Amino acid sequence: MALGAGHAHACRDDGDDSVIDAPPPYESVAGASAGQFVVIDIDTPTDSPPPYSAGTSPVGLVSPASSGDGEVCERGRSRRAAWRAARRARRRAERRARRRSFGPGGLFVETPLFLPETMIGAHPGVGGDLPSGLPTYAEATSDRPPTYAMVMAACPTEPPGGSVGPADQPRVQSSRTWRPPLVNSRELYRAQRAARCASSSDTPQAPGWCGGTCRHAVFGVVAVVVVIILAFLWR
């Protein structure tokens, strides 16, 4: 305000004929908030919605302004839709029951399969050849292998034919099987040399006879040579 008033006075002092008025006074926020506000009503419902019902359909909702014939038609449509939904649900339940009633291999089972913490049971008269050591539902979901006792109980000990052929009989092996003796190469050489010496002479000799005779003969020859050399040197 002071700036605008000063500017007006300056213009008057300059001698200008046009008079410039001061700007309007500033209105604070408090003054603006005291005014009237426009409220827009968009017809927002404040009541809670009706409870959900599986038998009703959005098609069945009829405005009160509709005629009586239209109301009857809408009610008939909603009833037919509810009947169709009920028939579909019944058929789905029957299909699930049929799927549960057939066990592994297509055999009919009265009790439902894959019950938690229960063994898979079959009718006593149907599927009697099924293995009895099947794991439970919890063991199957946790992916734990069956124990050795369960596997042995499930596997049949005898073939279905009852008779075992000669080719199927297990070979009876004694615990004392023949094995070649562990012989040292030196001992083998001595045995072979003794066998050669024994085969060359008619009289049976001891195993060490061939070696001792050869040594004595060599010593005798050496002694004779030494004696001859000493005799020549003595003369």
UniProtKB/Swiss-Prot annotation:
Protein keywords: Host cytoplasm, Host Golgi apparatus, Host membrane, Membrane, Transmembrane, Transmembrane helix
Signal peptide: none
GO cellular component terms, semicolon-separated: host cell Golgi membrane; membrane
Protein's membrane topology: Single-pass membrane protein
Principal location listed in the UniProt entry: host cell
Motif window: PPXY motif: 23-26, 49-52, 144-147
InterPro entries xref list: Herpes_UL56 (IPR007620)
Disulfide bonds: none
Top-level division of the source organism's lineage: Viruses
A Pfam family hit: Herpes_UL56
Positions of the UniProt region annotated as Disordered: 1-27, 45-74
Transmembrane feature ranges: 214-234
Location in or out of the cell: Host Golgi apparatus membrane; Host cytoplasm
Function, as annotated: Plays a role in the transport and release of virions form the host cytoplasm to the extracellular space. Relocalizes host NEDD4, a cytosolic E3 ligase, to cytoplasmic vesicles.
Family statement drawn from the similarity comment of this UniProt entry: Belongs to the herpesviridae UL56 family.
UniProt note: domains: Late-budding domains (L domains) are short sequence motifs essential for viral particle budding. They recruit proteins of the host ESCRT machinery (Endosomal Sorting Complex Required for Transport) or ESCRT-associated proteins. UL56 contains three L domains: the PPXY motifs which are involved in the interaction with ITCH, a member of the NEDD4 family.
Assembly with partners or alone: Interacts with host ITCH; this interaction induces ubiquitination and degradation of ITCH. Interacts with host NEDD4; this interaction increases NEDD4 ubiquitination. Interacts with UL11.
Protein name in UniProt: Protein UL56
